[in-house]
């Protein structure tokens, strides 16, 4: 109601956003003629002038109109592409730290150059984030001529790069890379033992391409650096064998909405009988409950060719949003091992977390964050609440001509597929290309078999054939082409009507500087083929004429195909099922009708589809039965469309709640991570950490006095225990209660005496060993102990989170309990850390003749990178005594401290 009133008074949000953007665009346009009049040298020197103005205190906002006008002119001169006004709007929105929603084919990559260039002038580095290595490299190379002309350096991060290559890439003004690489490099930077080993600079400004995919679809995916665990894998095989013996409905119940499986009372008894145990929920069987639960999910919730595929003896997760395989990614909490046992492949050992972060918390570290996508408006609430990002919808340069037809709904999946087959045959007969969207490999293969049986030639794009992705997408716009794509596989590559424009690659690789060749290339790009043909005749060699002839021939073939597809109605999108998120459906539709091209779309649904079956309304099914509809008859009505929209909104709301809830849990770890990494960086950045150690000594002394000598009555003190502690540090402390009885504040006097004695001992030790050796030694001791304690704490927190759900049975809030217990555990871990560092510092011994060990400067990589499976809650718990007393093998800090640490441990 309030929104409607505001809309009447102030206009819609879209209108309000445009009112803010249009005056700035006019200001940019007013500068176009003066910028156009500059020669190349003057134009390229603009960067230097802008930087000087920033140094003098001018803001980026005030430089924006000139900077954007400069980029527009440079783009035209170097690449032949001039930014449209709507792209200027997109660039302004990005610079403001917003999400620019721009439809497919509107030129998001070119739009980003505006905000990227402007923010690079600040000198703090700009990160451009893409969904895969290919797009990072493609976009960086594609836009590089603009940046090169302006004297702005560009770096690209690729998965297979070594440490030194990464340092060079991050040192550039602009760095392109994937969300995974940026996140993992951040974690690794917080595991190094020397500040020069860090690769990233600051987190100043990031533009995230396909922002909905990264910040929403992958929000529940933690990045994890792990080390090996000693846990055996035979338990997974043992538990896997009992699942086929359990009956659904009697022993367990499947909750498809929550994607969960719950044991019944009868099921618990049955499991106890099969495993020959008395009580499944006895403390010693906590892990067993967890593994039974995960095995049930592996068998009853997770399906092969839908959630994962088995390739070369390995279980590979399928991205539910793109249909792509996610190599190297594993489900967490033993679920992946349970699926491996189910599929009878080699079971990998569970790993132990050394460092982790979610994309939600990584990207919230940036001073300014922005994003681009074709579909963000439906998730505007989540972007605002989680990331404080506004979605600004940018109007298309040319209005969309695509015709979106109403959904057709059938009673059964069989009827639906028959109708789809009929429609595809009809479309292909008139040479209209069709992109068929499915939500799983399983469904795409069912449809593929039906098409093959009907003699319809087609291509399939899913996780099993993703290597051919670029080629299949490039040809999806050919006359009569039928392409089956799982979800949004191929996103990031435009489907061009008429098929791949191969001649463009030929033009780009033809580097001849001859003036006639240049004119020929320009006329081809403008589709002026008659003039191009006359230029070909004037070329001075047979070799040039032959190449020009090949290009002309290729253009003519494409143009003929292009016109044929236009006449047939453009690309038709045929959705075989509605996705849980409207945004994914909109992405599929958005593949058609780019830049004013004609196109059409329609979704075919059945009451047996997952969305309709699990979340849909029973009224639709009842209506179809009541109407006594014959087999094969479809229904098109507003009521059905509204019911589907409501179902999708319910699922979107449910998924948002899950992501928000998980973030509240992850925020607990994030606050702790910030404290640890800040402490670590303080050690790395300072050669002399004696002030930090002195503070630890004071805290340790204070804790010992509070523990053993409470209050101001010396007669009640346990001086013997205090003396025992001080002897362990070799303090040679002489104390007698008599000397403190006359003091006005006996406890304070005791603290001052013990503290000053400890500090004198600390200083004399540094003098004896040699200050240079001592500085290096205590920094290495600090980092080794910090990394070890942090790893142990992560292990304990993982198990706390895994079992915290059980407090719900006693009517306590699991999140509140997790925060309370997590805080207590962290407080204890920090106290133990300080005590251990002080104890180690006082006990370490180095012979008098020791020389300063040469500090190792080479970088050493530690741990395995895992993009974890979706975070989720599971059964099973670990009691506090087990988690706090865990024995974890110490691993070296990255950076090469192994030899030094070994020698210190021996001396200790």
UniProtKB/Swiss-Prot annotation:
Residues annotated for ATP binding in this entry: 87, 105-109, 494
Region annotated Disordered, chain positions: 871-908
Principal subcellular localization: membrane
Biological process according to GO: intracellular protein transmembrane transport; protein import; protein targeting; protein transport by the Sec complex
A GO cellular-component term linked to this record: cell envelope Sec protein transport complex
SUPFAM superfamilies linked: Helical scaffold and wing domains of SecA, P-loop containing nucleoside triphosphate hydrolases, Pre-protein crosslinking domain of SecA
Catalytic activity, EC: 7.4.2.8
Family annotation (SMART domains): SecA_DEAD, SecA_PP_bind
GO terms of molecular function: ATP binding; protein-exporting ATPase activity
Keywords: ATP-binding, Cell inner membrane, Cell membrane, Cytoplasm, Membrane, Nucleotide-binding, Protein transport, Translocase, Translocation, Transport
TM regions (residue ranges): none
Record's catalysed reaction(s): ATP + H2O + cellular proteinSide 1 = ADP + phosphate + cellular proteinSide 2
Membrane topology, as annotated: Peripheral membrane protein
InterPro entries assigned to the protein according to its UniProt record, in alphabetical order: Helicase_ATP-bd (IPR014001), P-loop_NTPase (IPR027417), SecA (IPR000185), SecA_CS (IPR020937), SecA_DEAD (IPR011115), SecA_motor_DEAD (IPR014018), SecA_preprotein_X-link_dom (IPR011130), SecA_SF2_C (IPR044722)
Listed Polar residues bias regions: 874-884
Keyword Glycoprotein belongs to the record: no
Annotated localization: Cell inner membrane; Cytoplasm
Record bears the keyword Ligase: no
CDD domains, alphabetized: DEXDc_SecA (cd17928), SF2_C_secA (cd18803)
Family (UniProt): Belongs to the SecA family.
Function: Part of the Sec protein translocase complex. Interacts with the SecYEG preprotein conducting channel. Has a central role in coupling the hydrolysis of ATP to the transfer of proteins into and across the cell membrane, serving as an ATP-driven molecular motor driving the stepwise translocation of polypeptide chains across the membrane.
Subunit structure: Monomer and homodimer. Part of the essential Sec protein translocation apparatus which comprises SecA, SecYEG and auxiliary proteins SecDF. Other proteins may also be involved.
Full protein name: Protein translocase subunit SecA
Organism, scientific name: Leptospira interrogans serogroup Icterohaemorrhagiae serovar Lai (strain 56601)
């Amino acid at each position: 109601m309030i929104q409607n009133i505001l809309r009447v008074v102030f206009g819609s949000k879209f209108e309000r956003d445009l009112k803010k953007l249009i005056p700035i665009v006019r200001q940019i346009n007013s500068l176009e003629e003066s910028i156009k009049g500059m020669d190349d040298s003057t134009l390229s020197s603009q960067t230097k002038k802008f930087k000087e103005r920033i140094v003098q205190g001018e803001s980026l906002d005030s430089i924006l109109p000139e900077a954007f006008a400069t980029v527009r002119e440079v783009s035209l001169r170097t690449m032949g592409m001039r930014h449209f006004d709507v792209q200027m709007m997109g660039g302004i929105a990005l610079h403001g730290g917003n999400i620019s929603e721009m439809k497919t084919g509107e030129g998001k990559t070119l739009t980003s150059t505006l905000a990227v260039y402007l923010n690079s002038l600040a000198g703090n580095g700009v990160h451009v984030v893409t969904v895969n290595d290919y797009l990072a490299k493609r976009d960086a190379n594609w836009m590089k001529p603009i940046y090169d002309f302006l004297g702005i350096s560009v770096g690209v991060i690729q998965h297979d790069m070594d440490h030194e290559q990464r340092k060079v890439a991050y040192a550039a003004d602009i760095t392109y890379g994937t969300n995974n690489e940026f996140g993992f490099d951040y974690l690794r930077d917080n595991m190094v033992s020397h500040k020069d080993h860090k690769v990233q600079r600051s987190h100043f400004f990031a533009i995230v391409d396909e922002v909905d995919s990264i910040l929403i679809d992958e929000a529940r995916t933690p990045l994890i650096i792990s080390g090996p665990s000693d846990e055996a894998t035979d338990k997974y095989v043992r538990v896997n064998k009992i699942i086929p013996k359990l009956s659904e409905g009697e022993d367990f119940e499947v909750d498809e909405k929550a994607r969960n499986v719950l044991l019944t009372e009868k099921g618990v008894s049955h499991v106890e009988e099969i495993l020959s145990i008395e009580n499944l929920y006895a403390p010693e069987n906590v892990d067993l409950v967890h593994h039974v639960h995960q095995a049930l999910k592996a068998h009853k919730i997770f399906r092969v060719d839908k959630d994962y595929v088995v390739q070369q003896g390995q279980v590979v997760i399928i991205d539910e949003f793109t249909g792509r395989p996610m190599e190297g990614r594993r489900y967490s909490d033993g679920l992946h091992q349970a699926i491996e046992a189910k599929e009878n492949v080699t079971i990998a050992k569970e790993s132990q977390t050394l460092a982790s972060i979610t994309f939600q918390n990584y990207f919230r570290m940036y001073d300014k964050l922005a994003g681009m996508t074709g579909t963000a408006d439906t998730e505007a609430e989540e972007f605002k609440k989680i990331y404080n990002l506004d979605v600004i919808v940018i109007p298309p340069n040319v209005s969309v001509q695509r015709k979106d037809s109403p959904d057709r709904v059938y009673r059964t999946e069989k009827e639906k597929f028959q109708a789809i087959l009929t429609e595809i045959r009809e479309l292909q007969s008139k040479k209209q290309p069709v992109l068929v969207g499915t939500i799983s490999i399983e469904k795409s293969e069912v449809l593929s078999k039906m098409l093959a049986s009907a003699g319809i030639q087609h291509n399939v794009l899913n996780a099993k054939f993703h290597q051919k992705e670029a080629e299949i997408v490039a040809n999806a716009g050919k006359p009569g082409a039928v392409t089956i794509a799982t979800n949004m596989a191929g996103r990031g590559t435009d489907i061009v009507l008429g098929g791949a424009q191969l001649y463009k690659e030929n033009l780009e690789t033809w580097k001849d500087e001859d003036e006639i060749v240049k004119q020929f290339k320009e006329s081809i790009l403008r589709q002026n083929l008659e003039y191009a043909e006359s230029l070909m005749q004037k070329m001075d060699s047979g070799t040039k004429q032959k190449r020009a002839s090949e290009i002309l021939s290729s253009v003519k073939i494409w143009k003929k195909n292009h016109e044929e597809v236009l006449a047939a109605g453009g690309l038709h999108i045929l959705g075989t099922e509605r996705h849980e998120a409207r945004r994914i459906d909109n992405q599929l539709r958005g593949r058609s009708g780019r830049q004013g091209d004609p196109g059409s779309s329609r979704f075919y649904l059945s009451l047996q589809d997952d969305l309709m079956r699990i979340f849909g309304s029973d009224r639709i099914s009842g209506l179809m039965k009541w109407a006594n509809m014959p087999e094969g008859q479809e229904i098109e009505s507003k009521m059905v469309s509204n019911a589907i929209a409501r179902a999708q909104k319910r699922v979107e709301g449910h998924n948002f709640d899950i992501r928000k809830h998980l973030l509240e849990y992850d925020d607990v770890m994030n606050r702790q991570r910030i404290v640890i990494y800040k402490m670590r960086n303080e050690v790395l950045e300072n050669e002399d950490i004696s002030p930090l150690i002195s503070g630890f000594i004071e805290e340790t002394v204070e804790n010992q006095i509070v523990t053993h000598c409470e209050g101001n009555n010396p007669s009640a003190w346990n001086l013997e225990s205090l003396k025992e502690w001080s002897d362990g540090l070799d303090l040679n402390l002489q104390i007698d209660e008599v000397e403190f009885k006359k003091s006005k504040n006996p406890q304070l006097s005791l603290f001052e005496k013990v503290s000053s004695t400890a500090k004198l001992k600390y200083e004399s030790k540094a003098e004896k060993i040699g200050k240079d050796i001592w500085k290096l030694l205590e920094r290495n001791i600090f980092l080794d102990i910090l990394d070890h304690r942090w790893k142990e704490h992560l292990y304990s927190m993982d198990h706390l989170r895994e079992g915290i759900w059980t407090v719900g049975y006693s009517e306590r809030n699991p999140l509140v309990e997790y925060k309370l217990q997590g805080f207590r555990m962290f407080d204890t871990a920090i106290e133990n850390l300080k005590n251990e560092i002080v104890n180690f510092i006082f006990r370490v011994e180095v012979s008098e003749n020791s020389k300063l060990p040469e500090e190792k400067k080479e970088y050493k990589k530690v741990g395995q990178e895992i993009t974890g499976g979706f975070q989720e809650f599971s059964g099973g718990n670990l009691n506090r005594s087990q988690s706090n007393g865990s024995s974890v093998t110490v691993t070296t800090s990255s950076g090469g401290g192994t030899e030094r640490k070994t020698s210190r441990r021996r001396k200790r």
